[in-house]
Regions:
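Hydrophobic residues positioned within well-ordered beta-strands of beta-sheet architectures
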Residues: 51, 159-161, 232-234
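Short, contiguous, helix-prone interaction/anchoring segments in small proteins
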Residues: 42-48, 52-56
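Short loop segments at secondary-structure junctions
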Residues: 53-54, 165-169, 241-242
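Fe(II)/2-oxoglutarate
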Residues: 1-44, 255-267
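Catalytic core of non-heme Fe(II) oxygenases with the double-stranded beta-helix
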Residues: 118-210, 216-217
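Catalytic core of Fe(II)/2-oxoglutarate
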Residues: 174-175, 184-267
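Signature of the catalytic double-stranded beta-helix
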Residues: 53-74, 87-135
Length: 267
């Protein structure tokens, strides 16, 4: 039996069909050519760059409402460690791609907006593509309990762009940390070695901000939540041209977010 497709609670004011146009107008005004050149230079140096005010406020409110509703109905809490990333923890609530595809039209249209690919390509300095593995197109995650964290890890595909919907003050944790120019050896992962070999940088973000990461060679994490902070994000995976011809595995994504498996459909 196929899962029903439900309307988004957020589409009353912002229609899914208008997402691409809203983003194109906003990004042209917020990030003109000179600004994008500065972002590209920073990304070339740090392999991560923050994008303050990336999402226009009306769209942010609508996407946040949509994601919060989806999380309330479908979020699954995980408390795991992954040997493949040197036993780092994942303590978080998640919703995977199949549910969002059907019940999150704003998130879906945000990811597939051509302007998103063009913008990220300007920042990273090469063409980018939507992920060939549907399970990594977009996922929603939330940290909202003391100690919740998305621990140190790398990703298979080269790039990620993360849209921040809710964020605690940095004093409550939930900020991003990144270690560029590191290598993920899945057979012998070495988080401490990576921490010793390169500089750790930390980035605080606010709702509506986004950040782009070179995720396959930048070890990164979300600092554990302290107290009652709450962080909700949409993580979107983008592929380099080289990624399209490279064999990939999806161990951590499938364990945390379910990959392409639809949890609404019984076995």
């Amino acid at each position: 039996m196929e899962a029903p497709i439900l309307p988004s609670v957020a589409t009353a004011e912002v229609q899914p069909s208008s997402v691409a146009e809203l983003m194109a107008t906003h990004l042209a005004e917020k990030f003109p050519a000179a600004s994008r050149a500065e972002l590209a230079a920073r990304f070339a140096d740090e392999h991560i760059v923050t994008l303050p005010g990336f999402c226009p406020p009306p769209l942010l409110a609508a996407v946040r409402d949509e994601a919060v509703d989806i999380m309330a109905r479908h979020g699954t809490y995980h408390d795991l460690t992954f040997e493949i990333t040197d036993n780092t923890p994942r303590r978080m609530r998640t919703v995977g791609q199949p549910v969002i595809r059907d019940e999150g039209p704003l998130v879906h249209n945000f990811y597939f907006a051509p302007v998103l690919l063009d913008f990220v390509a300007d920042v990273v300095g090469e063409p980018v593509h939507t992920c060939p593995y549907a399970g990594e197109h977009y996922v929603i995650s939330r940290l909202d309990a003391n100690g919740d964290t998305h621990g140190w890890h790398w990703d298979d595909y080269t790039y990620g762009i993360i849209l921040v919907l809710e964020a605690p003050h940095y004093t409550e944790g939930g900020f991003v940390q990144a270690v560029p120019n590191t290598h993920w050896d899945k057979g012998n992962p070495d988080v401490y070695g990576a921490l010793l070999s390169s500089q750790v940088r930390s980035y605080a973000l606010e709702p509506g901000d986004a950040y782009v990461v070179k995720t396959n060679t930048t070890m990164h994490r979300v600092h554990p939540i302290r107290g009652e902070g709450r962080r909700t994000i949409v993580n979107m995976t983008l592929a380099s041209t080289a990624d399209l011809d490279r064999p990939m595995t999806h161990e951590t994504n499938d364990a945390l977010f379910g990959g392409v498996r639809d949890p609404r459909i019984g076995s």
